[in-house]
Every structure is written in structure tokens, then in C-alpha cells.
Amino acid sequence: MLQPKRTKYRKQQKGRVTGVATRGHRIAFGSFAIKSLEGGWITARQIEAARIAMTRAMKREGQVWIRVFPDKPITQKPAEVRMGKGKGAPEYWVACIKPGTILFESGGVSIETAQESLRLAAQKLPFKTKFIVRPDYVAS
């Protein structure tokens, strides 16, 4: 599972996901990608599930790039604990995703294989996504 090796602070405030992505919104590494159409949080487990779905569908050929990293700790109090007594312990990690962010990229495979593998990955994610192709892509 993805998580930071060390952080300056153990806990963070919730915050809001506002606006659209101005960084990480173009294909940088591969020829194909999935782009988020909605904002929200994606957990480290969801990223890992999508990565496994992609690599299985691609049958270990080509390459996969994960463009998001879960760097925000989400805290939770234990079950049946009264309110108060401070904030809960960090439970899992999320990445804050704005609309337009590139989530996963792939390359080195045919467009049909890439489309199918990214479709399977998109099913594991908590928001709507879109399959995109690099503008200068030429099928070989």
C-alpha cells in the first residue's frame, strides 16, 4: 500500500477539494491515461486495486504509471467510544483528486488493450473517469 515514509505532522484537517486541476492534468509518461471527471478522495487501497486490475488485464506487457500519491492521513476513533478526548488515530491514507487530474497512465500496448485495462481500473475508483489518448499518438 502507498503511504509516505515520514510526515511533518501525524494528523491533518479534512479540507475541501475545490476547483479544477491545473497541475498533473496532461499525459506525461505513457500514451493512454484515465482522467478524473469529478473531485474527491481516493484511498491507497483503491489505488492498489486499480493497479492490480490494470496489470492483470495487460498480462504484464507494457508499462503502468501511477500519477497520484496518498499523502493525507484520515483519522478514525475506535468503535463505541464517546465523543471528545481528542482526535482519533490515523487509520488510512488518501490522495485529494481535483477534476481533470490524470490518475493512471499506460504505454507499450495496443489501444484496445490499454482501453480495456484502464476500464477495469476505472471500475475500482470512487468517481467518474474518462479514457484519453496522447494527442500525438500514432498507432504502430
Curated annotation (Swiss-Prot):
A single GO molecular function term of this UniProt record: tRNA binding
tRNA-binding as UniProt keyword: yes
Cellular component terms per the entry's GO annotation: cytosolic large ribosomal subunit
SUPFAM superfamilies named among the record's database cross-references: Ribosomal protein L16p/L10e
A Pfam entry, by short name: Ribosomal_L16
InterPro entries tied to this protein: Ribosomal_uL16, Ribosomal_uL16_bact-type, Ribosomal_uL16_CS, Ribosomal_uL16_dom, Ribosomal_uL16_sf
Keyword ATP-binding: no
Highest taxon above the source species: Bacteria
GO biological process, one term: translation
Record's keyword terms, sorted: Ribonucleoprotein, Ribosomal protein, RNA-binding, rRNA-binding, tRNA-binding
Subunit structure: Part of the 50S ribosomal subunit.
Role this protein plays: Binds 23S rRNA and is also seen to make contacts with the A and possibly P site tRNAs.
Family: Belongs to the universal ribosomal protein uL16 family.
Record PANTHER family: 50S/60S RIBOSOMAL PROTEIN L16, LARGE RIBOSOMAL SUBUNIT PROTEIN UL16M
Name of the protein described by the UniProt record: Large ribosomal subunit protein uL16
Organism: Cytophaga hutchinsonii (strain ATCC 33406 / DSM 1761 / CIP 103989 / NBRC 15051 / NCIMB 9469 / D465)
